[in-house]
Amino acid sequence: MNRRGFLAATATTLAMPRIARSQQARILRFIPQVDLPLLDPVANSAYITRNHGFAVFDTLFGQDSTFAAQPQMVDGVATEADGLTWRLTLRDGLRFHDNTPVLARDCVASIARWGKRDAFGQALMAATNELSADGDKVIVFRLKRPFPLLPAALGKVASNMCAMMPERMAATDPFGIIAEAVGSGPFRYVASERVPGARTVYERFEGYVPRPSGTADWTSGPKIAHVDRVEWNVIPDAFTASAALRSGQADWWQEPALDLVPSLRKDANIRLIELDPTGAPAIMRFNHLQPPFNNPGVRRALLGAVDQAEFMEAVAGAERELWKAGTGYFPSSSTMASTAGMAALTSKRDMAKVKADLAAAGYNGERTVVMVATDLPALAALGLVGADMLKRAGMNVEVQATDWGSVIQRRASKEPVEKGGWSVFFTSFFGLDQFTPATHLGLRANGTAGWFGWCDSPKLEALREEWLRAPDLPAQQALAARIQEQAFTDVPYLPLGEYSIPTATRKEVTGVLKGLPLFWGVQKA
């Protein structure tokens, strides 16, 4: 079925009598922030793909609400030789959705693939001398040096997730894309019901065996699926999505438009939940490979143009409690946040000086292509304010409005703008993704091996390596301050402030876990 046919069928369904309450209670109808563009949570850092990933795939460790790693697929962990050897034993009963058993060699291949793509994974693999399977149940790391953050790396909630998949899938080029989704998680992806642009469906995997003890907390603990189906129905228009939630045609709206939050808060049938307590840092990401932002002087000049309050007001408007200005390269909720170098963002704004600094840096009217995702209200607001800021600074701006899925695909292009490339895009992060240099994609500065935008700074990379080896929290904080100061010199991106978008559910929906949209534990009355 194509998208137009699906929407017509949906309209007909909305006019039909409701089906039996007992049957409806087994179906969770979810409105995602955007459509699912890609199925591979290892090769793609988009949050919508990560959310899909945690439904379908499982991880060796989970992460709880204190940000600590907890065994998930792993039953036992043993360290030997002063922390240079780690032996991870898989628990019994693990099966993939094709009903084949999860074996240690599947996990070894999955870790190796992820380790080539993820920032934290790259650090772990750089410290690893050998990764192997000892029989069907035991994964063995032999390290070059101690890496006490190994469980945290394998169990991180931040993109890119270390998803366990069959060896045949994990053999795929990590810079390619896997076109199927066969995991071992509590839900299986129903490819036959996929309608691009409109619908994604998951069914409870009857072969899933949850952990036998503990409490579900973020991605740790028993993952018990109480619903038979989870249906993601894309509704781009915020008023239509709001109406669907209010009428009971939808159960859960992932990201309500912030201007509708006050009215939703007054609805007795709706519950607003702070899903992510770490906030959403917003950024303007540069393409460091192409003019004009391959020039660090041009990037530095624009720091003086950023008015974080202006960006945040565009996103959240009157909902002042939902945003913060005066934030740097680490979220305000992180122990790594500091005031180091912050005068670059908090001093008096002077656009005349910005223009002079751009000219002194050598900006000569180069075309600047600004990608703006119009189907996500927060990113659309960031993009429009950012494009206007660049124009007021005297830059030659071309706004290219598109959907987020297209931005995700196009940002991979390293071509100049004349050949379909780009100069700037806007996004926001799950705050936990930026909590430390270990997981902070935006602060990786390893050139073309890094995240989209491809910042290249040996100094930032060296400081990150120092941080990974820091012996305690005070040492980590001191290094994080130095990293932030260096970031204000290299300017991998512009920090635009941070905001929080509550998630909205019907009151009869219970058991929603904090952290990110997770579908185990959720029940409908």
Segments from the language model and where they lie:
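Ligand/substrate-recognition segments at binding pockets and active sites
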Residues: A198, D237-T240, P256, K355-S428, ...
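Long beta-strand-rich cores associated with HINT superfamily self-processing modules
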Residues: T503-A525
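Extracytoplasmic/peripheral linker and loop segments enriched in polar/acidic and small residues
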Residues: S347, E398-S413, A438-K507
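Periplasmic-binding protein-like
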Residues: L289, F293-S334, A381-L382, A487-P495
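Surface-exposed binding/hinge segments that line
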Residues: T89, A123-V195
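Ligand-site clamp/hinge motif
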Residues: P210-S263, N396
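Structural transition elements
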Residues: F187, E321-A360, L376-A381
